[in-house]
From Swiss-Prot:
Domain description: The winged helix domain is involved in binding to DNA in the preinitiation complex.
InterPro entries tied to this protein: TF_E_archaea, TFIIE/TFIIEa_HTH, TFIIE_asu, TFIIEa/SarR/Rpc3_HTH_dom, WH-like_DNA-bd_sf, WH_DNA-bd_sf
GO molecular function, one term: DNA binding
Record-annotated HTH TFE/IIEalpha-type domain positions: 4-97
Organism whose genome encodes this protein: Caldivirga maquilingensis (strain ATCC 700844 / DSM 13496 / JCM 10307 / IC-167)
Annotated keywords: DNA-binding, Transcription, Transcription regulation
Protein name per the record: Transcription factor E
Function: Transcription factor that plays a role in the activation of archaeal genes transcribed by RNA polymerase. Facilitates transcription initiation by enhancing TATA-box recognition by TATA-box-binding protein (Tbp), and transcription factor B (Tfb) and RNA polymerase recruitment. Not absolutely required for transcription in vitro, but particularly important in cases where Tbp or Tfb function is not optimal. It dynamically alters the nucleic acid-binding properties of RNA polymerases by stabilizing the initiation complex and destabilizing elongation complexes.
One GO term of the biological process aspect: regulation of DNA-templated transcription
Family: Belongs to the TFE family.
Pfam families registered for this protein in UniProt: TFIIE_alpha (PF02002)
Keyword Transcription among UniProt keywords: yes
UniProt-listed SUPFAM superfamilies: Winged helix' DNA-binding domain (SSF46785)
Length: 183
């Protein structure tokens, strides 16, 4: 599981960085991920706040983001002593496995669509912004990028299909490894 755990850590950091635009929240997300994973038990947000040493609002934001990524599990329980509902958060190996399967599946779908597009229609690409255009779109824009007016370049699909085929094979192998539980 260890090599995949590092991939998940990097993904969590980048996703939080993109979503919230704050490097500190990215580091907090990794700290929360590591804490929940290493402890192997469900913890309330208050307990996590005291462990990681950040304010409760940021910890709750990160926990909610991890939950939205389908990486963290939450259980709600009524605490009679406090008189309120408390949420206990956890990250289990099965959560990580499910997360990886969903993520790899999404990437495989995108690679498949791109390979299909490359085999069915000529593709032109802008060398500056790397946006792809079909033959019809390139013709409509007079073979110039509509964003920066750079001349579009025709790409040889055989070169890209070879690379994408290798990427697809590697992803399928990774998916098989994760699905079998031999991660």
């Amino acid at each position: 599981m260890q090599p995949y755990i590092e991939l998940v850590r990097r993904y969590v950091y980048r996703r939080i960085l993109i979503e919230f635009g704050d490097d500190e929240l990215g580091k907090l997300a990794v700290a929360i991920f590591n804490t929940l994973l290493s402890r192997g038990e469900a913890m309330t947000d208050d307990k996590l706040t005291s462990i990681v040493g950040y304010n409760a609002i940021d910890v709750r934001r990160i926990l909610q983001a991890l939950y939205n990524m389908r990486l963290a599990s939450v259980v709600e329980e009524f605490n009679e002593a406090a008189g309120r509902i408390e949420q206990s958060w956890s990250i289990k190996d099965e959560d990580i496995r499910r997360f990886l399967i969903n993520l790899i599946g999404g990437v495989l779908d995108k690679v498949g669509v791109l390979m299909q597009q490359l085999t069915n229609t000529p593709i032109y690409i802008c060398p500056k912004c790397f946006k792809r255009y079909s033959e019809d779109d390139a013709l409509m824009y007079d073979y110039k990028c509509p964003l920066d007016r750079t001349p579009l370049e025709y790409i040889n699909p055989a070169d890209y299909l070879t690379v994408l085929g290798a990427v697809e094979a590697r992803l399928k192998k990774m998916m098989e490894s994760v699905s079998k539980g031999s991660v």
